[in-house]
Amino acid sequence: MSELQGGPGALFAIGGAEDKLKKRTVLQEFVEAAGGSKARIVVVPTASALGPDVIDVYRALFAALGAESVVGVRPENREDADDPAFISPLNDATGVFMTGGNQLKLAGVVTGTAFGRAVTAAHARGAAVGGTSAGASILAEHMIAFGRSGATPRQRMSQLSGGLGLVQGAIVDQHFAQRNRYGRLLSLVAQSPGLLGIGVDEDTAAVFRGSHLEVVGRGAVTIFDGSRITSNGHYAGRSEPLLASGVVLHVLPATATFDLQDRVLLSFGKQPPATELAEMEAAEADLRKLAKEIAAEGVSPKYYADRKRRAGRRTSKKSAAAGESRPEATEPITAGADSELPDRTQADNGNT
């Protein structure tokens, strides 16, 4: 795989159902990548079956997250997609966001048109380009047009279509865990082992920066690497289970960074703040100093631990001796029917 991203802008493949009401982590990250308070975002709802309300929702969301301006552009056919009036808002956009819906419709309208080329040009000059659900799938060179759910990969489980090609050498699927799309993505990797299978959960984004993939959000990004796969995809019958042996599986939660070129995990988790690192270094220095002082006295740390254990044993012996010297009660108390003390045997049995 020689190149996985065609330009300097960040690419956001969002698995759908991104949080719009609470933390809005994924959308906030997109706005920041698009320029934060200077972000000029174009919303493209072509895939959606909803009316103008979908534009209003994202306009309000991105404005609340600090974007400078948000406009909606909705080409409904290829004629619209070649009309300069639909294309001009993309010319100075710092972010392009494609909504969910019917990805085959989105691909049929946008790919191979002036509008699609304008999106690619925006990305090449540094704009963040993102999409949720259908808008995520179209980012790749090859996209899943439709398919069936299920955990087992089967022959002819899904259909491919052409995408924008911003992510090359990979297939992106969405709503991944929530709609059980493991089988259909793995079947495509089995049939095209050179393609990396990337499945994105809901409220999660696979963020492509150069040859690195970063995970943001509540779920995980699942990656199927079939570069060493053994498969029967070339002769399996229709709907038959596919052989997929030797596939490397990566499940990446938030903060994970993956090298798409070498297909390995680069990092996971965030480094502590500089102040915490300084405190940890100071604590380690104190421990080293204490160890030297103990060694200088000729007494090992084990000595102090042994002395503490011996002191504990002496205390136990004294307590036992004090117990033996107590006078016995003249009338032992028994737990009878009228006693206020509980029958210990019954109480223990009742708690097992």
Regions found by a protein language model. Name each.
Residues 13, 71-73, 97-98, 129-132, ...:
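General beta-strand structural signal in soluble alpha/beta enzymes
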Residues 103-113:
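Glycine/threonine-rich flexible loop motifs
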Residues 57, 111-116:
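Charged helix-capping and loop-helix junction motifs
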Residues 98-100, 119-143:
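Catalytic nucleophile loop
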Residues 1-37, 49-64, 144-145, 149-352:
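C-terminal and late-domain segments of enzyme folds
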Residues 42, 48-93, 98, 105:
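Portal/gating segments that form or line small-molecule/metal binding sites
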